[in-house]
Amino acid sequence: MQTPKETLSERLSCVQDKIIDHYENDSKDIDSQIQYWQLIRWENAIFFAAREHGIQTLNHQVVPAYNISKSKAHKAIELQMALQGLAQSAYKTEDWTLQDTCEELWNTEPTHCFKKGGQTVQVYFDGNKDNCMTYVAWDSVYYMTDAGTWDKTATCVSHRGLYYVKEGYNTFYIEFKSECEKYGNTGTWEVHFGNNVIDCNDSMCSTSDDTVSATQLVKQLQHTPSPYSSTVSVGTAKTYGQTSAATRPGHCGLAEKQHCGPVNPLLGAATPTGNNKRRKLCSGNTTPIIHLKGDRNSLKCLRYRLRKHSDHYRDISSTWHWTGAGNEKTGILTVTYHSETQRTKFLNTVAIPDSVQILVGYMTM
């Protein structure tokens, strides 16, 4: 009859042989990575059992302390379960390597997300190139939603920090103000991504889409739509007294906002012809717009593709959505125009996917 040490030694040899097979095979399917973390879990369970029996070595290996084996086993369970959930998503057919699913990358910011395609972001503090810190923006970030499903997005880089959009909300995992407090003295910093310097009003999103440059600039609208009408007219805030921040890289100019009164729903929809009564509700120019409504990921790709048609519109927003139950999965892009003629030309020239709904209206700028 075998002793506990002999039994555990045999089991450990079997498990570790299979772990070595995973290293040698370097498989790229997600099921192999799930099996790998299950083996790591078993390996540490064997070490834990050995400690319980007072065994100090197995197969000439020193048996780790209780807390070490327990901690490693818990981490293996965490990664195994995360990968099992990811395997139920649309991303299971992508390549998944040991490097993509390693513990070090899982614990790297943003934590508890799978990440691929890292790109360097350099931040210079105090205007001093010798006082520089390097951060990572990811082409792909795979995160678990509140509903327990998995979604995919990309890291965006702004003057404020590094973030990804999780269920319609910007989730920052690095904030440069906090970093500046640690590494700077003057409270100023410059953000360099690719060949660009990002100022207060710009952001850049990393992407793995072959049709899109990984360092394309995403210009944000400075006016946020106000939810008075979901189909035609949207009131916006009017800003004034804004201080230039171009020469102060660490401080964005702050502006007071004067809000227009809500649009009276009895006025009806504004049309390209006739009198627009909304002009009387607040000061500013009424600008022709369209809302493009559809799947958020599809809109993100569409927004980038529309850049080659920039002569056919004035501005384009980032993807946004109305708050409330059931609205998080549907995104909206707002496109503004210099004139109704330009808008008409845009609609007649630019191909919009059938899955995207087009809503025509006006915005007071």
UniProtKB/Swiss-Prot annotation:
The keyword Plastid does not apply. It comes from the Viruses. InterPro entries: E2/EBNA1_C_sf, Nucleotide-bd_a/b_plait_sf, Papillomavirus_E2_C, PPV_E2_N, Reg_prot_E2, Regulatory_protein_E2_N, Regulatory_protein_E2_N_1, Regulatory_protein_E2_N_2. It is found in: Host nucleus. Gene3D superfamilies: 3.30.70.330, E2 (early) protein, N terminal domain, subdomain 1, Papillomavirus E2 early protein domain. Residues 286-365 are annotated as: DNA-binding domain. Residues 1-205 are annotated as: Transactivation domain. Pfam families: PPV_E2_C (PF00511), PPV_E2_N (PF00508). Its main location: host cell. There is a cross-link at residue 293 (Glycyl lysine isopeptide (Lys-Gly) (interchain with G-Cter in SUMO)). Keywords: Activator, DNA replication, DNA-binding, Early protein, Host nucleus, Isopeptide bond, Phosphoprotein, Repressor, Transcription, Transcription regulation, Ubl conjugation. One of its GO terms (cellular component) is host cytoskeleton. Phosphorylated. Binds DNA as homodimer. Interacts with protein E1; this interaction greatly increases E1 DNA-binding activity. Interacts with protein L1; this interaction enhances E2-dependent replication and transcription activation. Interacts with protein L2; this interaction inhibits E2 transcriptional activity but not DNA replication function E2. Interacts with protein E7; this interaction inhibits E7 oncogenic activity. Interacts with host TAF1; this interaction modulates E2-dependent transcriptional regulation. Interacts with host BRD4; this interaction mediates E2 transcriptional activation function. HAMAP family: PPV_E2. Belongs to the papillomaviridae E2 protein family. This is Regulatory protein E2. It comes from Human papillomavirus type 18. The gene is E2.
